[in-house]
Curated annotation (Swiss-Prot):
Keyword field contains Transcription regulation: no
Keyword Lipid biosynthesis: no
Keywords: Acetylation, Disulfide bond, Endoplasmic reticulum, Glycoprotein, Hydrolase, Membrane, Metal-binding, Metalloprotease, Protease, Transmembrane, Transmembrane helix, Zinc
Protein name per UniProt: Endoplasmic reticulum metallopeptidase 1
Main location: endoplasmic reticulum
Length: 904
């Protein structure tokens, strides 16, 4: 395969090869004439020539000597990528027409919005609060009753309010154990009048985190489910199976309510599949980011039924890798119910997720309509499917699935995907193998140039990554992290341009000093082959690892290879002219369009997460790495243009100038990370806990007592931006770890201590909640197997955390929590998350300690923290006064808590 007709320079090189092999010293005229005939070996004969002209075109004749215009090539590629990005953006803004209001069988987004506004008007709905347990539950039951009155006689509606108590351990945030008591689930079963033996579950949660109205997480999902219930119940089409709607009231308590339902409710045994509605952002499209496990028929159901699909197996594999610090009820149904399902979530605008800005007015009616159309169609499909009743028969196998710009979904079994992938690999092997196996007198130095070019490509990527990481580390060290958080284009201008400039520099140096005697067209072909080979290696690796995401590499190998096979004749005759470039870019349309589509999703999800990922992970290093990787992928099939172009000086100068100016502006603090813009806020998250701590010794005496406001910034910048506004919050009040206390002696709400190691402690008066916690040892006894059993009782607010640290020579062997086996958190301590609904009894539990030797300092240290997340007890005058001082670009989430430590 050739990139162009044989140039005079190439002919001279071929003559030189023949001369070295004993040919005549000068080619006769007839040999020169024969040289005009096209080669059939698929190679330009090695491409080596005499010294290149200063222009760097790599040849003397037309086609080889006429290089691409640098300005035209650079602008053309830039406009090409911008056009593709515009198409991606347009696909994300597809408008959905609302069904006629009140028309039976149509989802009405305005009715769902009415539900949403009523739920969010109640305010924050933490588990155990009257807002969650009484007001929201009452509203849901009221609306369900109205729906039941309007329902078609073909259907039967049953309603149950469940208040489960239970415990489980979960491998999340380093691992911990959860205990819940008397929390609330509202369960509705819609079934045929004669009943049903099988059911599909739809799940949402109506509780919210503290200090947030929780419109997207997850009131909008519950509103969608209410409207879907209304539409299905009024339908004149009979269902084959039941649809169970679970409105759970304790998801934000780390998935407690779903565990209570699936392990204790009598209807749980009917469920064969589920759909979980969640949020990681506010509005936009709802992404299918988890399916299964296995059960490919569920993906097929979504593909067949969803009207506005948005799904990706890539998102599934990224989420299940644990990179994203989040989890959903999907895990509970999968692990404790052994039920397959589909997990959907809104992912756009995660900047205001779990903040006071998560309000109903920020969720577009279009988003509600899209979600409602999809959920209604998929539930109806499952409720009338024969596969639901025999789900076990269709259990085995995974699916490769992805949507195409939201228009439709492509899905096929992963085993078929593996076959397709290896067929693509074989195509590359045949293509490259033909070149590698040809005699040297035909291929010249192709093998050597290919291997050297591969090394140059890898060096260019490595040095580019090192360059952007050096920039990112420097920016982090000078305190200018997250400069791109409110201005994403800053990251592109800083890290993206640096990556491209370094790649171009390395290849330009190679072109000038190593490949100085090779034709441009020959080098263009070599580096196209190198890019093809690299993507083929990715394809083999991902397929061998069993990752369904390998389909992306297959696309990035198959389409470029087909493009090369289609355009080589035109290029051979006319060189790198406009027609060739147009066909080349057209052939790259699908891989580049889909890559940009995925890259948008990656940054839409990960950029906001980096603003709440803790104080230990440098966000600039993470973002720079991701951006550099994406840039390397996008530039891979354009590297050959560096060798086809006459020069790269202007491009490198422009990129370097943009990078340098952006770097200076970032270092000077021009780009402030946060925003209080009412239309698009991007706040800094800060947790304020006004607490009183009491430490007791082995005899029960209080040996230490203090009080203050414990401050945690949830991003890498800590309090550096806050100190100028609130001078008393500075590094002189940095909190210090209590080495002998579990989790450093602080009242962690969740075990995220390993993510947030920098915190501050501002002295303040003691707190005195009206409902103070009580903790006592009920009994201490020795078991027949020589362990010590300690039984405790605790009472307090709806949320408490219990911590245990075993002393040297002691181990926790059993306890009455979870499955009976104690689970450690990161750092070796034990963490128990406790919550209750209304009117819960005292919490009694026991632990068993195995002691190998007597210790005068006791066996274990335990501590209990009480968190007041609702009502008057959550506030204090000092806390309110401090909150008022915070600038409007922050979101300070504040509550009162106590911490009591004991030694036994």
């Amino acid at each position: 395969m050739e990139w162009g007709s044989e140039s005079a320079a190439v002919r001279r090189h071929r003559v030189g090869v023949e001369r070295r092999e004993g040919a005549a010293a000068a080619p006769p005229p007839e040999r020169e004439a024969r040289a005009q005939e096209p080669l059939v070996d698929g190679c330009s004969g090695g491409g080596r020539t005499r010294k290149r002209s200063p222009g760097g075109s790599g040849g003397a004749s037309r086609g080889a000597g006429t290089g691409l215009s640098e300005v035209r090539a650079a602008l053309g590629l830039a406009l090409y990528l911008i056009a593709l990005r515009t198409l991606v953006q347009l696909s994300l803004q597809q408008l959905v027409l609302r069904g006629a209001a009140g028309h039976r069988g149509e989802f009405d987004a305005l009715q769902a919005r009415d539900y949403l506004e009523h739920i969010t008007s109640i305010g924050p709905r933490t588990t155990g609060s009257p807002e969650n347990e009484i007001l929201t539950v009452h509203y849901l039951l009221e609306q369900i009753k109205l729906i039941e009155v309007q329902s078609n006689s073909l259907h039967k509606i049953s309603v149950d309010v469940q208040r489960p108590t239970g415990s489980f351990s979960i491998d999340f945030l380093g691992g911990f154990t959860s205990y819940y008591d008397n929390i609330t689930n509202v369960v509705v079963k819609l079934e045929p009048r004669d009943g049903a033996q099988h059911a599909v579950l739809a799940n949402c949660h109506f509780d919210s985190v503290a200090n947030s109205p929780g419109a997207s997480d997850d009131a909008v999902s519950c509103s969608v489910m209410l409207e879907v219930l209304r539409v299905l119940s009024t339908s004149s089409e009979a269902l084959h199976h039941a649809v169970i709607f679970l409105f759970n009231g304790a998801e934000e308590n780390v998935l407690q309510a779903s565990h209570g339902f699936i392990t204790q409710h009598p209807w749980a045994s009917l469920i064969r599949a589920f759909i979980n509605l969640e949020a990681a952002g506010v509005g936009g499209k709802e992404l299918v980011f988890q399916t299964g496990p296995e059960n490919p028929w569920l993906v097929q159901a979504y593909v067949s039924a969803a009207k506005h699909p948005f799904a990706s197996v890539v998102a599934q594999e990224v989420f299940q890798s644990g990179i994203i610090p989040s989890d959903t009820d999907f895990r509970i149904y999968r692990d404790f119910g052994n039920i397959p399902g589909i997990d959907l979530a809104f992912i756009e605008n995660g900047y205001i997720y779990h903040t006071k800005y998560d309000t109903a007015d920020r969720i577009l009616t279009d988003s509600i309509q899209r979600a409602g159309d999809n959920i209604l169609a998929v539930l109806k499909h499952l409720a009338t499917s024969d596969m639901l009743a025999a789900a076990s028969k269709y259990r085995h196998g995974n699916m490769v699935f992805f949507d195409v710009l939201g228009l439709f979904v492509i899905a096929y079994p992963s085993r078929i995907g593996s076959i397709i992938n290896y067929m693509v690999v074989m195509g590359v092997v045949l293509y490259l193998g033909k070149k590698f196996l040809q005699p040297k007198h035909k291929t010249g130095n192709y093998k050597k140039d290919f291997l050297c070019g591969l090394g140059i490509t890898l060096i260019s990527w490595f040095t580019s990554l090192v360059t952007v990481l050096i920039i990112a580390v420097f920016i982090s060290l000078i305190g200018q992290s997250l400069s791109w958080y409110n201005h994403f284009y800053v990251s592109v201008c800083l890290y993206g341009t640096a990556t491209v400039a370094k790649i171009i520099l390395i290849h330009t140096l190679a072109k000038r000093f190593y490949y100085m005697n090779a034709s441009a067209q020959y080098l263009g072909e070599v580096f196209f082959d190198i890019s093809l080979f690299v993507h083929c290696c990715f394809l083999v690796t991902l397929t061998y690892q069993g990752l369904c995401s390998a389909f992306i590499s297959a696309v990035w190998v198959a389409f470029p290879l087909l493009t090369k096979l289609c355009v080589h004749k035109d290029f051979k005759q006319h060189g790198a002219q406009g027609k060739f470039i147009a066909f080349y870019l057209l052939g790259m349309f699908i891989p580049y369009l889909y890559a940009l589509y995925l890259i948008w999703a990656v940054f839409e999800m990960f950029t906001p997460i980096l603003g709440r990922s803790g104080s230990e992970i440098p966000p600039d290093v993470v973002l720079a790495s991701i951006l550099a990787g994406c840039t390397m992928i996008l530039s891979s099939y354009f590297i050959n243009f560096i060798y086809l172009a006459k020069s790269t000086k202007k491009t490198m100068l422009t990129l370097t100038l943009v990078c340098a100016i952006t770097f200076l502006l970032v270092c000077s603090g021009t780009f402030f990370p946060y925003s209080s813009n009412p239309a698009n806020p991007k706040p800094k998250r800060v947790f304020l806990q006004h607490m009183t701590r009491t430490f007791h010794d082995l005899e029960g005496n209080a040996v230490k007592r203090d009080s203050g406001i414990w401050i945690n910034g949830f991003d890498y910048t800590g309090i550096s931006h806050i100190t100028p506004h609130i001078p008393e919050i500075n590094d002189s009040i940095r909190a210090h770890c209590e080495e002998n206390a579990p989790l450093c002696g602080f009242p962690w709400y969740l075990p995220v201590h390993f993510l947030i190691r920098k915190n501050w402690y501002l002295p303040a008066p003691e707190v005195s909640p009206r409902n103070p916690p009580h903790f006592r040892l009920i009994s201490k006894e020795q078991t027949p197997w020589d362990s010590i059993k300690l039984t405790f009782e605790a009472t307090g607010p709806s949320h408490m955390s219990f911590y245990v640290r075993a002393h040297k020579g002691s181990t926790l062997s059993q306890w009455s929590l979870g499955n009976g086996t104690p689970v450690t958190s990161k750092g070796g301590d034990y963490f128990v998350f406790y919550s209750h609904g209304l009117q819960a009894s005292a919490w009694q539990f026991w632990i068993e300690v195995q002691v190998s030797e007597e210790h005068p300092e006791g066996m274990v240290t335990v501590a209990i923290a009480a968190h007041y997340l609702s009502g008057e007890d959550k506030r204090s005058p000092q806390l309110d006064a401090l909150k008022e001082k915070f600038p409007d670009w922050t979101f300070p989430s504040a509550w009162v808590c106590t911490y009591d430590l004991f030694v036994f």
